[in-house]
A protein has these predicted regions:
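N-terminal trafficking/processing presequences and adjacent post-cleavage segments
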Residues: 1-12, 95-113
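N-terminal mature ectodomain segment of secretory-pathway/periplasmic proteins
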Residues: 24-105
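Short, solvent-exposed secondary-structure boundary motifs
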Residues: 48-59, 73-82, 125-138, 153-159, ...
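Short, solvent-exposed aromatic-acidic interface loops
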Residues: 77-83, 101-107, 180-184, 216-221
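Gly/Pro-enriched, hydrophobic low-complexity segments
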Residues: 152-239
Length: 240
């Protein structure tokens, strides 16, 4: 039987488990600590492109975040003028994989292996703002203060740490997430590339306060390349 995630209360004393910046953030992000889920389901709409100057494709997606372990599953349906693509990006127990299919049947892209696992673990870390209960309940996370408005969160993948930097604004909300090295596929070659995401428009959805808009991109030699933009349409705290 899986243990229930740890409880946390905004009325409790500051926790030594994570930095003060994170503790203050949680006090706003989880207004009702009595609702403790096993996982958080986020529904998104947005657009994504594969290369600078490339055509944007609209998508609708659901993403499940585990609260007690570093694990997620993102399932998306992309629509374009000539085709429909489905994508599954997921990570659990140190293993990650990405699958893209045409019409949900014909495989057109796959990725896996150690580099993919590290990149997907970083994705989980960078999206903790959509599952704040995982900050409290996930024992696989480690925290380090980087400055007055920044922390680092890390986890282990195959015995080696992976980390993401989280920056907060003057109000105490998360504003950006970043890493100097995240795996980017260039053809069939994995290249470590600087990566960053920005979030905004905080609102309470499904009982938690989250950023409802986000965009992410690579920091390329020619300048930033934003490849994903999306907004949250629904959040469910689930115990199934």
């Amino acid at each position: 039987m899986t243990a229930r995630p740890a409880r946390w209360s905004p009325d409790s004393e500051p926790s030594a488990r994570f930095p003060g910046l994170v503790d203050r953030y949680l006090r706003r992000a989880i207004p009702d600590p009595s609702r403790v889920p096993y996982r958080v389901r986020v529904t998104q709409r947005g657009r994504m492109r594969m290369k600078p100057g490339g055509r944007w494709m609209r998508f609708h997606a659901t993403e499940d975040f585990q609260v007690r372990s570093v694990a997620f599953s993102w399932r998306a349906r992309f629509t374009g003028p000539l085709s429909v693509l489905t994508a599954v990006d997921e990570y659990a127990a140190g293993t990650g994989r990405l699958r893209v299919r045409l019409l949900g049947v014909v495989p057109i892209a796959t990725a896996g292996g150690p580099a993919t696992a590290r990149a997907q673990a970083q994705r989980y870390l960078s999206e903790l703002f959509w599952a704040p209960h995982a900050i409290v309940g996930n024992p696989e996370l480690r925290w380090r203060v980087l400055g007055e408005h920044a922390v680092e969160v890390s986890t282990m993948v195959a015995g080696s740490p992976v980390a993401v930097r989280i920056d907060f604004d003057d109000l105490g909300d998360i504003s950006t997430v970043s890493t100097p090295a995240r795996t980017r596929l260039v053809g069939s070659t994995a290249v470590d590339t600087a990566w960053a995401g920005r979030v905004s428009d905080f609102a309470t959805i499904g009982g938690i306060r989250v950023p409802t808009r986000a965009e992410v991109g690579w920091q390329l030699p020619d300048g930033p390349f934003v490849y994903w933009q999306g907004h949250v349409t629904d959040i469910e705290l689930r115990n199934d």
